[in-house]
């Protein structure tokens, strides 16, 4: 077969544009492509909910790729092993209660699990605001290309509609911080966006399932963003809580929308 460059270009533009347009109206929009949101996306999509992840960077996976200090291994507790099993991620016991997995394999299979279930992922998309309606309830997101932000270009964004939004942007809790800053009187949780405490893995992991919840009408938090909003400690390269948080936020949303 003789290849034609323009046909290649048209195939990419047309096929992506169809999907991008289709996902301007979704059930669940997850902001941030870290492990918690990847896990959530799989379960949400399997439940038949139209699910999309927007990732600001080129690669999804958040901080999981590099393990701890660029040693590509992560630790997972026994409580979360069933999630590794469901995604087909291999692991072994290091010592009692501590299980080790390859961080690169883990991210690859989390991505595969989410997309194979039917979730869509758009990378290099920056979520710069939320869309609101009556009573300042969130009804979608305001998006632009990450390149626009990096280049400091004056380019108006576009908007997508979503029944619920999940802030899975990690330490900065970008969506929650935006809502608190831009919606007069908005209070996320009891104290607003507090910011994470210093590292205390045991406490941070235990608190994560309590902090994973709806914090503002139609806005949920998962993963490190949940602890950042609540003022709970950071956990470091132990990922059991992240995985469980993703599953929990999916279950909360499925119970509501499913």
UniProtKB/Swiss-Prot annotation:
GO MF: iron ion binding; pentosyltransferase activity
Pathway annotation from the record: Cofactor biosynthesis; thiamine diphosphate biosynthesis
EC numbers: 2.4.2.59
Catalysed reaction, written as an equation: hydrogen sulfide + glycine + NAD(+) = ADP-5-ethyl-4-methylthiazole-2-carboxylate + nicotinamide + 3 H2O + H(+)
UniProt keyword list: Iron, Metal-binding, NAD, Thiamine biosynthesis, Transferase
Database matches in InterPro entries: FAD/NAD-bd_sf, Thi4_fam, Thi4_prok
PANTHER family: THIAMINE THIAZOLE SYNTHASE
Protein name per its UniProtKB record: Thiamine thiazole synthase
Source organism: Methanococcoides burtonii (strain DSM 6242 / NBRC 107633 / OCM 468 / ACE-M)
Gene name tied to this protein: thi4
């Amino acid at each position: 077969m003789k290849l034609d460059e323009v046909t290649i270009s048209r195939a990419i533009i047309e096929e992506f544009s169809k999907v991008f347009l289709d996902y301007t109206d979704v059930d669940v929009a997850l902001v941030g492509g870290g492990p918690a949101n990847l896990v959530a996306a799989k379960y949400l999509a399997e439940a038949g909910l139209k699910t999309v992840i927007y990732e600001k960077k080129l690669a999804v996976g958040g901080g999981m790729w590099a393990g701890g200090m660029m040693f590509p291994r992560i630790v997972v507790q026994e409580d979360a092993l069933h999630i590794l099993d469901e995604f087909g991620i291999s692991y072994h016991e290091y010592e009692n209660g501590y299980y080790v997995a390859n961080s690169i394999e883990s991210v690859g299979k989390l991505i595969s699990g989410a997309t194979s279930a039917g979730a869509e992922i758009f990378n290099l998309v920056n979520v710069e605001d939320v869309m609101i309606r009556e009573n300042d309830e969130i009804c979608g997101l305001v998006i632009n290309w990450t390149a626009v932000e990096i280049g400091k270009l004056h380019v108006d964004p576009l908007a997508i509609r979503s029944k619920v939004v999940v802030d899975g942007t990690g330490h900065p809790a970008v969506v929650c911080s935006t809502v608190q800053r831009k919606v007069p009187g908005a209070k996320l949780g009891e104290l607003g966006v507090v910011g994470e405490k210093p590292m205390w893995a045991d406490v941070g992991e235990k608190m994560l399932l309590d902090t994973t919840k709806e914090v503002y009408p139609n806005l949920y938090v998962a993963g490190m963003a949940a602890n950042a909003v609540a003022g709970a400690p950071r956990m470091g390269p132990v990922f059991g809580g992240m995985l469980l948080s993703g599953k929990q936020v999916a279950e909360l949303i499925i119970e509501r929308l499913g």
